[in-house]
Amino acid sequence: GGNPEDVRPASGWLVNCILSKHADAMDCYPEPTVLPREPGDRQEAETLSRILPVLLKNDRFRRTYSKAWWDKLKSGCAVYGVFWDNEKLHGLGDVSIRSMDVLNLFWEPGVTDIQESEHFFCTELVPNNHLVRRWPELEGKLGRGGAQVSRYLFDDKVDTSEQSLVVDWYYHTEREGRQVLQYCKFVGENVLYATENDPEMAARGWYDHGKYPFVFDTLFPEEGTPCGYGYVDLCKSAQKQIDLMNQAILKNTLAAATPRFFIRADGAVNENEYADWTRPFVHTNGNLGADSIAPIRVPALDSVYVAVLQNKIAEMKETAGNRDVMSGGTAG
């Protein structure tokens, strides 16, 4: 409430919480270690333990891991896409791990494990000229389609009029008692590729493991969804209360530090000269009475309100588990 021109401070306690958690995650960057299931697997496990770190390093997974943790801390869910990229290593192909935008992913409502979803869709807006360059048969067939996806609110104007929505559709079929992962890529009504139309892939499927190539990493899980909630959801109420109390304290401080006066209408005091602290003389008309001008008293703020603010900040630290970091302690 109050004047729309009032100062509206926004403190960074919630941001500081997320920064601290992200730093902890990067300090604890995982290294893959493959353990054998039986003694005969020991050699293969040791070989994989040496190969996987190199694979992840070549894929710059540390950068992907950092991006995913930002998403996980803020929105409560990070999604990794694990694909086979035929263009890597000069056409030999290699594994590619990407951090996915959950706004571009769609699955069956109500499932907690995406592998139980009947279908899974991954969407992306791609410039039309890029699509025509790769698939010349799309010339003249691309336009503004009816499908829309959620987008972030950008400071800049992002023009998507010359872009088309490309959909990667994953679904399962049964073949000889085995679950087969099928894949279809299309834009509008134009199918760009489908495993069921490929004789070499129809029986085998897109990937041998038969699973959707997406891994959901949830911070605080919720029922009925593979996503969860993050520290923004957990601490935004306390952050809002801290900012409101900061605003009230700051308004009181500014009111006390900015002198204001009651002036009688017939007090005959030159207000402009009185308000100008650089002028040593102030003109008046007639006798200047004690009640001609009087300062406006601003009640001093009781220390209990500052204590409530500090307690609210401490509550956020405790809620987010950041108390040890803020006080210089260690968790060990």
Where are these regions (language model features)?
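Extended alpha-helical, oligomerization-prone segments that build pores/tubes and scaffolds
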Residues: G1-G332
